[in-house]
UniProtKB/Swiss-Prot annotation:
Species this chain originates from: Shewanella baltica (strain OS155 / ATCC BAA-1091)
First-level EC class: transferase
Cell compartment(s), UniProt: Cytoplasm
Residues reported in the UniProt entry to bind S-adenosyl-L-methionine: 10, 45, 66, 123
Protein EC: 2.1.1.67
GO biological process: methylation; response to metal ion
NCBIfam families linked: PRK13255.1, TMPT_Se_Te
Chief localisation class: cytoplasm
Presence of keyword S-adenosyl-L-methionine: yes
PANTHER family cross-referenced by the UniProt entry: THIOPURINE S-METHYLTRANSFERASE (PTHR10259:SF11)
Keyword Chloroplast among record annotations: no
Family according to the record: Belongs to the class I-like SAM-binding methyltransferase superfamily. TPMT family.
Protein known as: Thiopurine S-methyltransferase
Length: 218
């Protein structure tokens, strides 16, 4: 995923990956992480996801990282949230009461920003990367998370040849092979969601599975 590709998607508002509702797996499984209300939660490649509002409503302090400036600005404007903006190194920092977003490259995000994080949520980050870049992202995510951090990972899997991503297909085998060195992995759920995704039906994708994993940083 080249930066120019991502910026163009947002500029053209070709953001089919953005969900208009809170992710059902987040609602169903987040409480299984057993987190105190004031937990700091890291959301990589957060876009303008409404899931961050859900996390804030649980009492959490949300720290997001997003490459595209328009996505960050739309998050605050769409949700009618006042914010302050400052510069932190290479990143622009947007702050409201419980949500703190860093606009810039996740690969240059300072570890100091996430050193107090004890939880994370990845619904649209891992599946945003083509396979050639995905393992590099997974290692960067692990490097940003303190040992013992727990998180919810949501993935999509389908025959990759049937559709040009993003979102890209991430199989259970890939998760096990590439994440198990840094995380303990528990499969929470896997279900067929093809009927809920018209884009995939239109492209004649034969099947589409959404899976939820509980991860714990080793």
């Amino acid at each position: 995923m080249e930066p120019g590709f991502w910026h163009e998607k947002w500029h053209q508002q070709q953001i089919g990956f953005h969900q208009q509702d809170i992710n059902p797996f987040l609602v169903k499984y987040w409480q299984q992480l057993g987190l105190p209300a004031d937990t700091q939660v890291f959301v990589p490649l957060c876009g303008k996801s409404l899931d961050m509002c859900f996390l804030a409503e649980q009492g959490h302090q949300v720290i997001g990282c997003e490459l595209n400036e328009l996505a960050v600005q739309q998050f605050f404007s769409d949700n009618q949230l006042e914010m302050t903006q400052t510069t932190v190194g290479e990143h622009q920092h947007y702050q409201t009461e419980q949500i703190s977003l860093y606009q810039g490259d996740i690969f240059t995000l300072p570890n100091a920003i996430t050193q107090e994080v004890t939880a994370f949520y990845d619904r649209a980050a891992l599946i945003a990367w083509p396979e050639s870049m995905r393992a590099q992202y997974a290692k960067q995510l692990a490097s940003l998370l303190p040992s013992g951090s727990v998180g919810l990972l949501v993935t999509l899997d389908y025959p990759q040849e049937a559709l040009i991503g993003p979102p890209f297909a991430v199989s259970p085998t890939w998760v096990e092979q590439h994440l198990s060195d840094d995380f303990d992995i528990e499969v929470l759920a896997s279900q067929d969601v093809l009927a809920d995704n018209p884009r995939f039906i239109k492209k004649a994708v034969p099947w589409l599975n959404e899976a939820a994993y509980l991860l714990k940083r080793k």
